[in-house]
Structure formats: structure tokens, C-alpha cells
């Protein structure tokens, strides 16, 4: 009986071990499947996030615009539809004018122009810097030349640029192929008015008859071009025209900034401390000053300050 019971216990143990091994294998398989599903889900999430970003980039932003009174003046007849359908914007660009601040000098900028001019008229100023009494001389700041201009950019709603065109056909045939390809509505195209093709640069300018076609194509970033049963993806991007207007060169004297000299022989080398004492002195009306915007001094290496018109 004892031997039979031992055999039974041995068999039970082996069965339990076999079950545990099976369970481990099943668990490992389940973990592997879950891991695989997680990887797939992460990839799907990345794709959805990319699509969401693209949708956000291309979609319009709705924003409340304050009411504006508009006065009707006249009716204009545009020479072409593109005159009113194109997008245009402009910006003003002004260069910063550098000024080199030498050792022993300081620049002080006041809020009001008349304060700066008064400080210059007084010319000499006794300023207490820690335990030293310093005689500073106020001078106007003469600036080098700078430039300013307007940049006008127009984005066409009727034209698109095409690049990366394969060099597989003669010029006239490729021009016809481009016109045919971009006129296919199933690919987002429309009726083509004109194709300007450059074989050397492998690029083209496509002009459509109707506005709106260019927008649809540009959202795709590339476009299918079939040549000899082969599909090539050509790159598309907006056609823009840029013009510079009202280019001007300016120079002169800063109206609110004053050059102070006489700091060369100061014992202290802490520029921030000196700047604080100068600011405190020139903020007082009894010293001929007023509200100070900024002070910058040089006690060691020269500094470069930048002025805008």
C-alpha cells in the first residue's frame, strides 16, 4: 500500500508540475500577445496623432473678430480672378544698429526724450559711486547707418510649383503629360490653363483655371505623375511672389539714450553696482534726470549695444 501511495503522490506531483508548465507557457503566450497588441496600439496612436497634427495645421482657425465699421467707396473690376483670390501679406523690417561701448563708458536710456536732452545740455554730472565721487560727461549717441523696408508676399490661389519631375520625356511631351495629370479630378486636380516646364531644373509652374484646385493639391504635399505605367511622386508647394518696397537708409542720433564717459579710473569692477548708482542718480529730478529705462556700462571689455529706429 505504501508503494502505491508513493506512486500516486509522484504521479500527482508530475501532473501538477505539468499543469504549472502549461500555465507558464500559456501566460507567456498571453503576455507575448498583449505586448504585440500594445506595440500595434502605440503605432496606431502615433499615426492618429500625426493625422491630427496635419489636420490642425491645415484647418482654419475660427476666432471672434471685433466689429468694424466699413464704408463702401467704389466698385473695382479686376483684370483677372486671381487678383481677389490670392493671399497677400506684408511686414516692416528694420535692422538693428550696433554701437560699441568702450571701457569707462556707459549708456543710459530715459523714458522721455526731453529728459535725455536736458542731461546732455547739463553736460557734467557729479555721481556718487559707493565711496567715490565721479565726474561724468554726457554726450549724444551718434549711430551708424541702418536700413528699413517693407516685404510684400503674395501667395497664389491659382498656381502651384512642382519639383522632382523625372527626366524621362522630351520637353514638349512632359509639358503635355503634366497638363493631363494635373487636370484629373480623381487625383484632386482641375482644368489647367498653362504649364511652364523647365527641363534643366526638373520643375514646373502649373496655372489652373479655377481657384480652389491649388489648395486641394497643396494639402497632399506630393502628387502622382504616371509615365510609362510607372507612378512618380512629384513635390508640390505654393507659388509666391516677394517684393521689397520703401527701402530706406537711416542714420542719426539717439533721442532717448545718452553716452556717459569718465568711468575709467573707478576702483570697483562690478558693473551692476555701478549701473545701480548711475540709475539712482539720474532718476532724481534735482539732478536733471527722470524715469530711467536701462543703464549699461563697460568697466573692462567693450560691449556691443543694439539700437532700433
From Swiss-Prot:
Q: Which family does it belong to?
A: Belongs to the NMI family.
Post-translational note: Ubiquitinated. 'Lys-63'-linked ubiquitination by TRIM21 promotes interaction with IFI35 and inhibits virus-triggered type I IFN-beta production.
Originating gene: NMI
Q: Which UniProt keywords apply?
A: Coiled coil, Cytoplasm, Immunity, Innate immunity, Isopeptide bond, Nucleus, Secreted, Ubl conjugation
Subcellular location per the Swiss-Prot or TrEMBL entry: Cytoplasm; Nucleus; Secreted
Q: Does the keyword Protein transport apply?
A: no
**Any matching Pfam family:** NID
What InterPro entries does its record include? Nmi/IFP35_dom (IPR009909), Nmi/IFP35_N (IPR009938), Nucleotide-bd_a/b_plait_sf (IPR012677)
Q: Where is the NID domain?
A: 104-193, 202-294
Q: Where is this cross-link: Glycyl lysine isopeptide (Lys-Gly) (interchain with G-Cter in ubiquitin)?
A: 23
> What domain of life does the native source organism fall in?
Eukaryota
Subunit comment for this entry? Interacts with MYCN and MYC, as well as with other transcription factors with a Zip, HLH or a HLH-Zip motif. Interacts with all STAT proteins except STAT2. Interacts with IRF7, the interaction is direct and leads to the inhibition of IRF7-mediated type I IFN production. Interacts (via coiled-coil domain) with TRIM21 (via the SPRY domain); the interaction leads to 'Lys-63'-linked ubiquitination of NMI. Interacts with IFI35; the interaction is direct and is facilitated by TRIM21. Interacts with TLR4; the interaction is direct and leads to NF-kappa-B activation.
Q: What is this protein called?
A: N-myc-interactor
What does the UniProt entry state concerning the protein's domains?
The coiled-coil domain is necessary for interaction with TRIM21 and for TRIM21-mediated ubiquitination of NMI. The NID domains are necessary for the interaction with IFI35. The NID domain 1 is necessary and IRF7.
Q: Which residues form a coiled coil?
A: 23-65
Q: What processes does the entry annotate via GO biological process terms?
A: innate immune response; macrophage activation involved in immune response; negative regulation of cell population proliferation; negative regulation of innate immune response; negative regulation of non-canonical NF-kappaB signal transduction; positive regulation of inflammatory response; positive regulation of innate immune response; positive regulation of non-canonical NF-kappaB signal transduction
State any GO CC term.
cytoplasm
Please explain the role this protein plays, according to its UniProt record: Acts as a signaling pathway regulator involved in innate immune system response. In response to interleukin 2/IL2 and interferon IFN-gamma/IFNG, interacts with signal transducer and activator of transcription/STAT which activate the transcription of downstream genes involved in a multitude of signals for development and homeostasis. Enhances the recruitment of CBP/p300 coactivators to STAT1 and STAT5, resulting in increased STAT1- and STAT5-dependent transcription.
Amino acid at each position: 500500500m505504501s508503494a502505491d501511495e508513493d506512486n500516486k503522490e509522484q504521479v500527482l506531483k508530475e501532473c501538477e508540475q505539468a499543469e504549472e508548465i502549461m500555465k507558464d507557457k500559456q501566460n507567456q503566450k498571453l503576455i507575448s500577445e498583449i505586448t504585440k497588441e500594445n506595440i500595434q496600439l502605440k503605432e496606431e496612436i502615433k499615426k492618429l496623432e500625426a493625422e491630427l497634427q496635419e489636420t490642425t495645421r491645415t484647418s482654419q482657425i475660427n476666432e471672434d473678430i471685433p466689429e468694424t465699421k466699413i464704408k463702401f467707396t467704389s466698385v473695382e473690376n479686376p483684370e483677372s480672378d486671381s487678383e481677389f483670390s490670392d493671399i497677400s501679406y506684408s511686414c516692416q523690417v528694420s535692422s538693428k544698429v550696433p554701437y560699441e561701448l568702450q571701457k569707462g563708458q556707459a549708456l543710459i536710456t530715459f523714458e522721455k526724450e526731453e529728459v535725455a536732452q536736458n542731461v546732455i545740455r547739463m553736460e557734467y554730472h557729479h555721481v556718487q559711486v559707493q565711496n567715490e565721487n565721479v565726474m561724468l560727461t554726457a554726450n549724444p549717441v551718434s549711430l551708424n547707418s541702418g536700413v528699413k523696408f517693407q516685404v510684400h508676399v503674395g501667395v497664389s490661389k491659382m498656381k502651384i510649383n512642382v519639383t522632382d519631375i523625372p527626366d524621362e520625356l522630351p520637353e514638349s511631351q512632359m509639358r503635355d503629360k503634366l497638363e493631363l495629370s494635373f487636370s484629373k479630378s480623381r487625383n484632386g486636380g482641375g482644368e489647367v490653363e498653362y504649364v511652364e516646364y523647365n527641363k534643366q531644373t526638373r520643375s514646373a509652374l502649373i496655372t489652373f483655371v479655377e481657384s480652389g484646385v491649388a489648395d486641394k493639391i497643396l494639402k497632399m504635399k506630393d502628387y502622382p505623375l504616371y509615365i510609362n505605367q510607372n507612378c512618380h511622386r512629384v513635390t508640390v508647394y505654393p507659388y509666391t511672389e516677394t517684393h521689397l518696397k520703401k527701402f530706406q537708409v537711416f542714420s542719426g542720433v539717439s533721442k532717448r539714450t545718452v553716452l556717459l564717459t569718465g568711468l575709467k579710473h573707478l576702483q570697483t569692477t562690478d558693473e551692476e553696482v555701478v549701473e545701480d548708482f548711475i540709475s539712482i542718480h539720474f532718476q532724481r529730478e534735482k539732478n536733471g534726470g527722470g524715469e530711467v529705462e536701462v543703464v549699461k556700462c563697460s568697466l573692462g571689455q567693450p560691449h556691443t549695444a543694439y539700437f532700433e529706429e
